[in-house]
């Protein structure tokens, strides 16, 4: 993978000139000049997904110049490097092969000359056998009762992905009740334990090293709670399984290593839902539906790795994102799913994007002088419309938005879905085209309003428009289409990282806080006044000690 400063390319310089020409062009102008704009700036993925990127401040020339940037930064070579098992995560000397986890074609993928697919398939088969025993009731707890509840204990990628997917695919869930515990705040585990019965609960402890502070603190609390009821430590093996590679620590915890599900160092945490970390997904929706999830992602992998940049959906979305982030100065992107089951999708890709591309040092080790990852946030529609859309419509920040919705709902109650989708369509239209002063004035005149009131109120009712959006319309949210959608965003993030010349698959930014917390923890064990930090941190710790009693 080449290390190219994007700002030093001819394409970047051309884009800077092009931006000067485009900065005052409106989306309304672009539509007025081209009646075929939708057909030119939208694309389908099979019969599952329509991506409409026509309501953006782009022309065919913009896209051509952005694609030139991708070529100069050797995006094609980087894609090949990832899919072939090259160790593109150089700061950790690791391959990046979440694509191997969903490689349904089973074509060999090599790491250090060894095909990883036999091991991937072996773990999948083990997940299948285990999950079928739990779901069928064949697996019994220590009192002979079947499992009714599953508690996944993990954090970051070991929590966000499985939680997001099990929520998004709730229409496919079986009788098992799923719970997720991540926060080291004791409230999180305490509230979940109030809801479950030790005789019928299975705990999944998701930690590659089996040393993650938050996860192991929660796991030991769950174990203590369980043993208060079960008594004998030998019963732990019937109620705990591990998603880990540390067989020694897993065995010492009391878990039968036969119920330890492995994954590999080429699986990054925020890309791990496709691995053994997805066992909670399998237990929720069944193995066959999990395979459909993998198949949808694999289909997008094939699209990404074989489709030219001009028609490549992850590449197009990535390039448009760079256009706004680096030329228009937009610092943020909103992900707005119009589907309540998808309520954790934005949070999942908040980690996926910000932990991947939130870097200020390039692949050469130099501090960058351009923008890297955007701030990602969002909530489901229509809730967001009554919360933060005001700023998107009439604020001073540019917030490019992705609107996501299914054409077919899993809950066809009355006309709920038509009302939901009418808002989905209306919002992107309103953001793009706005509402002029002339229209507002005419509305007031038609209502017979007092002219003095009109002059005062009109400025507040004007919508400038020209706010960019993408619309992603799914036929229906199924395991297959969700898998494809997740992979679409994963590859968008990778594409941006390649072009921005940063390492997307490490996350050193999480380390310093952990190191300092480990230093502070012993200082909280007693009531002695602390003076070993800066005055602010000392003051906070000492007030905490005074107040805790």
Curated annotation (Swiss-Prot):
Give an example GO molecular function: glucose-6-phosphate isomerase activity
Q: Name one GO biological process term.
A: glycolytic process
- Please indicate if the UniProt record lists Isomerase as a keyword: yes
Q: Which residues carry this modification: N6-acetyllysine?
A: 80, 228, 234
Q: Per UniProt, what is one Pfam family of this protein?
A: PGI
Its annotated pathway reads:
Carbohydrate biosynthesis; gluconeogenesis; Carbohydrate degradation; glycolysis; D-glyceraldehyde 3-phosphate and glycerone phosphate from D-glucose: step 2/4
Keywords carried by this UniProt record: Acetylation, Cytoplasm, Gluconeogenesis, Glycolysis, Isomerase
Q: Can you list the GO cellular component terms from the UniProt entry? A: cytosol
Catalytic function, reaction form: alpha-D-glucose 6-phosphate = beta-D-fructose 6-phosphate
**EC number(s) from the headed UniProt entry:** 5.3.1.9
List the transmembrane segments: none
CDD domains given in the database record: SIS_PGI_1, SIS_PGI_2
Where in or outside the cell it occurs: the entry states:
Cytoplasm
PANTHER family the record matches: GLUCOSE-6-PHOSPHATE ISOMERASE
NCBIfam families found in the cross-reference section = PRK00179.1
Family recorded in the similarity comment: Belongs to the GPI family.
The protein depicted here goes by the name Glucose-6-phosphate isomerase
**Organism of provenance:** Escherichia coli O139:H28 (strain E24377A / ETEC)
């Amino acid at each position: 993978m080449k290390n190219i400063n994007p700002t030093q390319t001819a394409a970047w310089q051309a884009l800077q000139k092009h931006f000067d020409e485009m900065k005052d062009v409106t989306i309304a102008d672009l539509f007025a000049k081209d009646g075929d704009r939708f057909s030119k700036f939208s694309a389908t993925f099979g019969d599952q997904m329509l991506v409409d990127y026509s309501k953006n401040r782009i022309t065919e020339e913009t896209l051509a110049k952005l694609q030139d940037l991708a070529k100069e930064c050797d995006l094609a070579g980087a894609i090949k490097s990832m899919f072939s098992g090259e160790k593109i995560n150089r700061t950790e000397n690791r391959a990046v092969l979440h694509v191997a986890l969903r490689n349904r074609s089973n074509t060999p993928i090599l790491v250090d000359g060894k095909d990883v697919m036999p091991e991937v398939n072996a773990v999948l088969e083990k997940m299948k056998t285990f999950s079928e025993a739990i779901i069928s009731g064949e697996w019994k707890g220590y009192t002979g009762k079947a499992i009714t509840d599953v508690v996944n204990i993990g954090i970051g990628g070991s929590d966000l992905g499985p939680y997001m997917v099990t929520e998004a695919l709730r229409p496919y869930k079986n009788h098992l009740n799923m719970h997720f515990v991540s926060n080291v705040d004791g409230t999180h585990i305490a509230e979940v334990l109030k809801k479950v019965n030790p005789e019928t609960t299975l705990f999944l402890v998701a930690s590659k090293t089996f040393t993650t502070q938050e996860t192991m603190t929660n796991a030991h609390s769950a174990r203590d709670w369980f043993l208060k009821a079960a008594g004998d430590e030998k019963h732990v093996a019937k109620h705990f399984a591990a998603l880990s590679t540390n067989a020694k620590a897993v065995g010492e915890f009391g878990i039968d290593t036969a119920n330890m599900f492995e994954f590999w160092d080429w699986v990054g945490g925020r890309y791990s839902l496709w691995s053994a970390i997805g066992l909670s997904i399998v237990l929720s929706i069944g193995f066959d539906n999990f395979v459909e999830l993998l198949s949808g992602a694999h289909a997008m992998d094939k699209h990404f790795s074989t489709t030219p940049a001009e028609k490549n959906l992850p590449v197009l979305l990535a390039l448009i994102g760079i256009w706004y982030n680096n030329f228009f100065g937009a610092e943020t992107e909103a992900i707005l799913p119009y589907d309540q089951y998808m309520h954790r999708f934005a949070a999942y890709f908040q980690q996926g994007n910000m932990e991947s591309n939130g870097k200020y040092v390039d692949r050469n080790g130099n501090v960058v002088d351009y923008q890297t990852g955007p701030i990602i946030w969002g909530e489901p529609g229509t809730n967001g419309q009554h919360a933060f859309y005001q700023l998107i419509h009439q604020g001073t920040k540019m917030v490019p938005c992705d609107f996501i919705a299914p054409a077919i709902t899993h809950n066809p109650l009355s006309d709920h879905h038509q009302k939901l989708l009418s808002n989905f369509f209306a919002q992107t239209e309103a953001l793009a085209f706005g509402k002029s002063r002339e229209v507002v004035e005419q509305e007031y005149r038609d209502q017979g309003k007092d002219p003095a009131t009109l002059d005062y109120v009109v400025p507040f009712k004007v919508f400038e428009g020209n706010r960019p959006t993408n619309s992603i319309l799914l036929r229906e949210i199924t395991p297959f289409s969700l898998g494809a959608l997740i992979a679409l965003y994963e590859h968008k993030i990778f594409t941006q990282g390649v072009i921005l010349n940063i390492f997307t698959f490490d996350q050193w930014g999480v380390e310093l806080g952990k190191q300092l917390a480990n230093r502070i923890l012993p200082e909280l064990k007693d009531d002695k006044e602390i003076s070993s930090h800066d005055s602010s941190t000392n003051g906070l710790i000492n007030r905490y000690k005074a107040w805790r009693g």
